[in-house]
């Protein structure tokens, strides 16, 4: 059986559609990271504790886990153009509502709303790419759009406190409202450029029972394995993104130095996302996955044995290479599983992100628990290395399962 990439003709205007998806994902990153640099101001203004603020910051992820699968089903039935626009509206409404929050519960509800819009964007983006790109172009397109959240997060972190807070008279609510309107603008841009999206495999008819579609996706053994692998990938990515500064500080770096060093894997990750996914075609995909998981493994081990020594920069580079492309290549593999394709990419993407966010929440929590028990990060880094090793081992059965489906070449 030939891969889907050999069956679909390139679609005119696909790069404009990719630009629209990137804008949506960038707005996703803006609003996802928008609270972090404003936490001290919000806590002081609303009179809430660190513990309460922690529940606010995690509210959208909790909702996201349960909303991702229904959102994926909506994507396949509604179509990407309308569904992604609704995602942008929900994210924009979340940002604007945060800006008007006057107490803890209002802020909590506003942030939770992001968990309803976010899955439409994150599950819809790979569906748009699978509908419009083929072969190496598909990998490149996925690598490009996946940089959007990182760019949005960096813009939020770099501009909120140094530029926007002084410019807006120290009113943190106006900053959050600005990010909300950025999401609405991205939604309008997508509505303009997203016209004409087609699905050559045919849409799922609204009359088709939902459980049939869910069962059809989960009945595929490669999909089930990829969902398990997604938990491991998000455990590593979210653990490192949330704890890296503290890990470096624990190893002896000052807070300013640790913050600067933490930029290294972020920059390397962008380069990785723009280069490696386009190589992950056909049977080469498995070699790329093993390489990425190996980079994560050796990065964690170098942190363990090297600390702030001469191996530090190599460890940061390896973690950046892995973090920039692991998720992208895994999603690329998912949407090309026979029985998924463009037709069920939204549903499969919903399952992917629902499962993955279990690791996204659990990874950082596990690191915090291990640190609290030992007073250091050695056991936590050993756990991340073990997860990477398990991911390497999972590539072999994944290749065998896909070969049985006629995908491996």
What feature does the model see in each segment?
Residues 110-148:
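Cytoplasmic helix-loop-helix junction between adjacent transmembrane helices
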Residues 35-36, 222-263, 270-273:
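Extracytoplasmic gate region of multi-pass secondary transporters
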Residues 284-333:
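C-terminal transmembrane helical hairpin of 12-TM major facilitator-type secondary transporters
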Residues 66-102:
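Conserved MFS/SLC helix-loop-helix module at the cytosolic interface between two early adjacent transmembrane helices
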Residues 77-87, 281-293:
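Cytoplasmic membrane-interface "Motif A"-like loop-to-helix N-cap segments
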Residues 341-374:
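A late C-terminal transmembrane helix in Major Facilitator Superfamily
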Residues 144-194:
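Helix-loop-helix hairpin linking two adjacent transmembrane segments in secondary transporters
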Residues 3-11, 196-225:
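Juxtamembrane intracellular "pre-TM" segments in multi-pass secondary transporters
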């Amino acid at each position: 059986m030939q891969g889907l990439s050999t069956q679909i003709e390139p679609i005119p205007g696909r790069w404009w559609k990719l630009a629209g998806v990137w804008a949506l994902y960038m707005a996703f990153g803006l609003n996802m990271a928008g609270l972090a640099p404003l936490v001290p101001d919000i806590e002081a203004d609303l009179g809430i504790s660190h513990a309460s603020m922690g529940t606010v910051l995690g509210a959208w992820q909790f909702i996201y886990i349960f909303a991702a699968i229904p959102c994926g089903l909506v994507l396949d039935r509604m179509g990407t153009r309308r569904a992604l626009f609704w995602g942008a509206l929900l994210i924009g409404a979340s940002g604007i509502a945060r800006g008007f929050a006057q107490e803890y519960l209002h802020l909590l509800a506003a942030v939770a709303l992001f968990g309803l819009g976010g899955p439409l964007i994150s599950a819809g983006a790979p569906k748009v790419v699978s509908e419009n790109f083929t072969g190496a172009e598909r990998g490149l397109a996925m690598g490009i759009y996946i940089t959007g959240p990182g760019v949005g997060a960096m813009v939020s972190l770099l501009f909120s406190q140094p530029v926007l807070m002084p410019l807006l008279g120290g009113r943190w609510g106006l900053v959050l409202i600005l990010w909300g309107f950025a999401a609405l603008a991205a939604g309008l841009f997508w509505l303009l450029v997203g016209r004409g999206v087609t699905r050559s495999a045919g849409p799922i008819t609204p009359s088709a029972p939902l459980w049939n579609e869910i069962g059809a996706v989960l009945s595929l053994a490669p999909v089930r394995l990829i969902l398990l692998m997604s938990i491991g990938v998000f455990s590593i990515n979210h653990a490192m993104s949330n704890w890296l500064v503290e890990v470096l500080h624990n190893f002896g770096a000052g807070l300013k130095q640790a913050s600067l060093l933490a930029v290294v894997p972020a920059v390397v990750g962008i380069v990785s996302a723009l280069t490696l996914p386009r190589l992950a075609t056909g049977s080469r995909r498995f070699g790329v996955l093993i390489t990425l998981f190996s980079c994560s493994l050796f990065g964690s081990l170098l942190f363990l044995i090297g600390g702030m020594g001469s191996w530090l920069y190599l460890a940061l580079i390896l973690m950046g290479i892995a973090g920039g492309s692991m998720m992208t290549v895994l999603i690329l593999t998912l949407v090309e599983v026979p029985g998924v394709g463009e037709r069920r990419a939204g549903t499969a993407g919903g399952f992917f992100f629902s499962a993955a966010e279990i690791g996204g929440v659990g990874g950082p929590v596990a690191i915090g628990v291990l640190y609290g028990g030992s007073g250091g990060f050695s056991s936590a880094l050993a756990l991340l290395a073990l997860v990477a090793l398990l991911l390497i081992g999972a590539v072999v059965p994944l290749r065998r399962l896909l070969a049985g489906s006629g995908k491996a070449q």
